[in-house]
């Protein structure tokens, strides 16, 4: 982790130098070329888009009886190990799903013999495309490195596939932060599989489901620091 922490320290110093530079910007008068008609057309397109999303969201929620997981709460406790550098990765997470939309929060903790590094990753909005038994998604959010007071924009792409009476789930995902002067803070490729082994009735048809999981994670920091983890843990779902 020493290389990652060193690069983050450089990022922090660049941020402080930039904020202390006192750069001023001159005023300029920019004439707008947008006409009333083009603005009206833009609002019309936006309105149609909103109507389409509302319609598809309604259709997705109507399928809840056949696919109850479309409105659900997920949690995960998992850990990974990278043998080459004796590094341990913890990534507990929680996610709420409501039709086409999800929000996900996770904490990531890296620990080796010399140091530890925490990040808080929040995918504020994930947009789901449910094509049962496949669900594709894309998300937008940020990752925060509290010890260095740094925050990066982060996006995600991925997909989930359910089979064997929807008890077996595979998921692949990609996450990446914005490009800064030092390159991308982090890129991540993750693949996991889990199988529901038991469930407990909570209320009416809602059940609390327990699924052991295994997986693999590849992470690259600042375009040059590679890490590979074998994962194990437990996923929890409520629907």
Language model regions located:
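Membrane-embedded beta-strand positions of outer-membrane beta-barrel proteins
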Residues: 73-79, 103-105, 136-140, 157, ...
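Hydrophobic, well-structured mid-protein blocks that either form specific transmembrane helices
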Residues: 115-161
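Transmembrane beta-strands of outer-membrane beta-barrel pores
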Residues: 77-83, 98-102, 107-113, 126-128, ...
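Short loop/turn motifs that connect adjacent beta-strands in outer-membrane beta-barrel proteins
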Residues: 61-71, 97-100, 129-135, 164-167, ...
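Surface-exposed strand-loop-strand hairpins of Gram-negative outer-membrane beta-barrel proteins
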Residues: 60-67, 75-91
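Residues that define the transmembrane beta-barrel architecture of outer-membrane proteins
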Residues: 69-71, 86-90, 97-99, 116-120, ...
């Amino acid at each position: 982790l020493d290389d990652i922490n060193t690069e983050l320290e450089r990022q922090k110093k660049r941020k402080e130098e930039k904020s202390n530079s006192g750069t001023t910007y001159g005023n300029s008068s920019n004439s707008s070329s947008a006409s009333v008609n083009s603005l009206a057309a833009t609002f019309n397109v936006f309105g149609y888009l909103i109507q389409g999303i509302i319609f598809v969201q309604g259709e997705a929620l109507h399928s809840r009886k056949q696919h109850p997981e479309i409105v659900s709460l997920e949690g995960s406790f998992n850990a990974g190990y990278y043998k080459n550098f004796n590094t341990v990765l913890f990534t507990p997470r929680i996610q709420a799903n409501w039709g086409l939309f999800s929000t996900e929060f996770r904490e990531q903790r890296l620990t080796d013999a010399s140091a530890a590094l925490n990040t808080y990753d929040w995918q504020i909005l994930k947009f789901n495309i449910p094509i049962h038994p496949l669900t594709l998604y894309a998300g937008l959010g940020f990752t925060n490195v509290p010890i260095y007071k740094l925050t990066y924009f982060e996006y995600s792409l991925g997909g989930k596939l359910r089979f064997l009476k929807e008890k077996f789930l595979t998921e692949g995902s990609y996450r990446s932060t914005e490009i800064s002067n030092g390159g991308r803070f982090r890129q991540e490729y993750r693949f996991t599989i889990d199988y529901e082994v038991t469930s407990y009735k909570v209320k009416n048809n809602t059940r609390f489901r327990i699924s052991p999981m295994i997986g693999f994670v590849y992470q690259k920091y600042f375009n040059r620091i590679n890490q590979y983890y074998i994962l194990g843990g437990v996923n929890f779902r409520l629907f």
